[in-house]
Structure formats: C-alpha cells, structure tokens
Amino acid sequence: MRSDIPETLQNFVSTKTVHQTWAKTFFCKPQAIFQPRTVDEIRELVDQARINGKTIMTVGSGHSPSDMTMTKEWLCNLDRFNQVLKKEEFSGPTRNGEGEEVKFVDLTVQAGCRIYELNRYLKENELAIQNLGSISDQSMAGVISTGTHGSTQYHGLVSQQVVSIEIMNSAGKLITCSSMENTQLFKAAMLSLGKIGIITHVTLRTIPKYTIKSKQEIIKFDTLLKNWDTVWLDSEFIRVWWFPYSGNCVCWRASKSSEPLSKPRDSWYGTWFGRKFYESLLWISVHICPHLTPLIEKFVFKNQYGDVETLGHGDVAVQNSVEGLNMDCLFSQFVNEWSTPLSSGQDVLIKLNDVIQTAREQNRFYVHAPIEVRCSNLTYSEKPFVDENDEPSLYPNKKWLAKRDRLSPGPIPGNNLRPYLDNSSNLRYDGDGANVTNDQLTLFINATMYRPFHTNVNSQEWYQLFEDIMTNASGRPHWAKNFIGVNGAHRTDQDLRKQLEFGGKTSYSMKGFNPILKKWFGENLVEYNKVRESMDPDNVFLSGKDWAVRNGILIDV
C-alpha cells in the first residue's frame, strides 16, 4: 500500500517506476504509473487527478522518441484495457450483381489494445486492417493520436479508418464522437496528442483478409527522379528506401492479392549475425571512423539487396497484409520525418542529396540509410457518407459498395474528415479517389539516424539542414518524431534543462515550432484549443506541457 496514492487507485497502480521511449532517448520517473482495467478505474483515476491537482500522461508503446510523453506526475498505461468488444459485419452487392458479400466489418476495441494484438484477432477472424504504418507495436489510441500513416496513393492517415471514438473528459464523462456526432471533438481526437482526454474506445473499419503481392526493385536515384511522375501511381502501396552514398534506391510496390503466401525474401541483416555485424559497423562509424559511413552503407546494401539495377524485373513476394505493410526498423534510432506536397519531391530530394554529398566531401557529417520516402493521400471531402436516401450516414451506401470487391484498391473509410492537427499541406480534394493524381499526394521523407547499441549519434547539423530544406518546400514535421524546430523567445535555458532532466542530450534537444505553428495551422489550431479547453477545463490532461508550449500547441482562445 503506497501512502502517496489515493486508496481507490491502489488496485491498479503498477510496480513499474520508470517510463522510457522505445529508443531509450528519454526516460522519466513519474510519481505513479497506473494500469486501469475498466472504464470505472479510468474514471476514478481522472477524478482523483482532478481532486488532487495532478496531471495524467497517457502512454502506449513509447515509440515517439522525443520527450512528448515525459512527466513527473501521474502516468496512465492502458495495456490491460485491451479487449475487442464488438464485431459488426456489413454486406453489399457483389460487382457482378449476383448476390451479396461481406464488404467491411466494424470492430469496437478498448483503446489500450496494441495493433499487434488486434492483428492476431483479425487473423483469427479472417479480417485485416486496411492500412498500416511501419510497425504494429502502438496502442489503438496511440496510433491515431500522433498522425500515423502508411505509404499509398489511396489511403490517408490510419485514423481515416476510424468510425467513432469514445473519450473521457476531465470530469470523468465519456463522450462519443464521429463524423455524425460531436464532429469538432472527433476532428481533435483523431490527432489529439494526448491533450484532449483519455481515449477509451475506438471503432475501426476493417475488411476481409487479403495478402500483399509486392515487387521489389533496385533502382538508381536518378531513375527515381526520372520516373517521378509515374512511380507513385503504379500500385496501391509504395515505398522507397534511398541509400544516398551508393546512389541506389529500393522501390517496393504492392497491391492487395488473394494469392497464397510465398517464401519470405532473403535478408542478410535479418539473421542474427548480419544484424549484430551491421550494428557493430554502425558503432565504429559513429564513434571511431565517421568517414567509413559511405563504405558501410555500400557494403550493407550489396549484401542485403545486391548491386544490379532491376527496374521492370524485381523480385516478387506474397506476404500476409501485416508483414507486407510493416517493416523491420532495425535498431534504436532518431527519426525526423516531414511532409511536403509530392509535387515538390524531386526538388527536395535533389537538394538533400547535394547537402549530403557536400558534407561528405568536407568530412562535416555523415547520414544513415535508408532515408525513407513515402506518400499518402491526405485529401478529404469533409462530409459524412450518404445513404440510399441521400441522408448523412456513418456507412457508405450499397451503390458505392457495389463498385468494389475484396481486392479493390483504396479504403472503405471510417470517416472523411481532416483532423485539426493533420500536418500535411491541406491539398485540394478532387473527387472520390478513383483517379488519383500526384497533385493530391503528400510526400513523407524520414531521415533516420541509428543509435548503435543505444549509444548517441550527433544528428544536429544534418537535421537542421534537412528541416531548412523541408520548411522551404512548405513542409511540416511529424508530431511523433525527433524534429529540432526554430529559434525564438520560446527557446529558454529552463526548457533545455527540463529536456536534460529526462535523460536528453544537448545534441538532440528540441527548439520547437512555437513561433510559427499558428501560421501553419491557422483556424484549425484555434478550433483544436477550443475543444481542448471544453474537454479539460481543469488541465488534468496538460501533462507534458513543456513539449506542448515549445511547439506552440497551446494558444488562448
């Protein structure tokens, strides 16, 4: 029995005393870590926090490598609140008009359910998530709270699959929101940054299971630039890994399939030896001989992928949907990902390449590979579906569903609304997505710097130049990553000290985007803060306030 914890919370206080990021870049020792198992326990935690003047930080897997989840007060982890509660099937006419088939299945899950746990349930029930990011470790609440996305010309953020959300405010009241109900709250909750309330339940739109048939080609960097106008529109899913010192890229393109699984692709660093050897080489390049970095990249690329361009005849594999859409993130890392209109992509990559090669020639700094290049369709109609009577609905009508079969590209969305804090460039919506153009697509560029054996690498100069180029291309940072930010009055010694208190280092400290965030988000930031204040007048969920202030999230409304 802990004397510093209210009696009503004793049954679900954890024995854990430390919270740290997955990459071990930051850690904190909260006053207490709670793992509620029921809605009543979550409500009691919120009530006691309000009564005792505490703040609550809600965390899942800790994959955000910045200090955004660090706190000295109360921390809530929902890993024990992780059940699938409801399964609702929806059928529609087959494409040939001869009968009906299951088109989608809406699942209501407790928000602590990890994506890998949900994937197990889906596999058992012959279902699948429509679009995934690079990993499946996040919680259901976490995957939608920071703007997780995949890489596809048709799909948007993972939150596009969300039909409705239940969220608890600082008074302990559960509120349901969707594209039909409490829409302002819904647009805030779909990318909440944990500052709106505690998400308790999510209804997610899933579809019948599918496999992923992919073609993986080795292409030159110049080939990517030459084929820029067509490469992104060739398949439903696409991602590119760029290895700047070798001048190579891996172009992975894939579509839904019903074909049986094939033998997995060979992976040199997928073996125990290859993985440890690669990480050891990185350690040497980071701490002893930085100038070896280009040679190490070329060595690893040749062993993993070969050294022959295979455009038009790459190797083909069929995987289950999770293995196809997820990827091996390898080692502890800093990640700095930004979005920009895809139409700016060629110019951006050329400028980044110039910076990388110049820095190598001058022995100033070296970058790690791959640099991940992805795209998403973040255009939204901002309207609910309509039913057969042209009335607003949470569900697409049967006429729309009749155009699709199980392998049709693109989503059956859970909603068509843009979250207030969506960090894309707000490109123009142009129809129902049947004929996508590059002008509708947002490019994501992710600059990874590995931390071999959890040791630090100095990424500051590279990341600052990277951010300058992205900013000049109308870019914006991914909320959950290691961005640096801009100089300004918000940058104080006190804020830096707080980052260092949580285990951070000056070499990867964050300045934040306080001076320019309101310009970026305009009225959407105002609306987000209106929702935040209405949901949390007691500031129970204003944990991690330093990160929020540093980045200009909080404004007076």
From Swiss-Prot:
Molecular function in Gene Ontology: D-arabinono-1,4-lactone oxidase activity; FAD binding
Top EC class for this record: oxidoreductase
A Pfam family the protein falls into: FAD_binding_4
Pathway: Cofactor biosynthesis; D-erythroascorbate biosynthesis; dehydro-D-arabinono-1,4-lactone from D-arabinose: step 2/2
Reactions catalysed, as given in the entry: D-arabinono-1,4-lactone + O2 = dehydro-D-arabinono-1,4-lactone + H2O2 + H(+)
UniProt cofactor(s): FAD
Superkingdom of origin organism: Eukaryota
InterPro entries: ALO_C, FAD-bd_PCMH, FAD-bd_PCMH-like_sf, FAD-bd_PCMH_sub1, FAD-bd_PCMH_sub2, FAD_lactone_oxidase-like, Oxid_FAD_bind_N, Oxy_OxRdtase_FAD_BS
Disulfide bond annotation, renumbered to this chain: none
Residues that bear Pros-8alpha-FAD histidine: 63
Zinc-finger listed as a keyword: no
Record's GO cellular component terms: mitochondrial membrane
Localization annotation: Mitochondrion membrane
Start and end residues of each FAD-binding PCMH-type domain: 26-209
EC number: 1.1.3.37
Keyword rRNA-binding: no
Keywords: FAD, Flavoprotein, Membrane, Mitochondrion, Oxidoreductase
Family (UniProt): Belongs to the oxygen-dependent FAD-linked oxidoreductase family.
NCBIfam families named in the record: FAD_lactone_ox
Name under which the protein is recorded: D-arabinono-1,4-lactone oxidase
Gene name of the encoded protein: ALO1
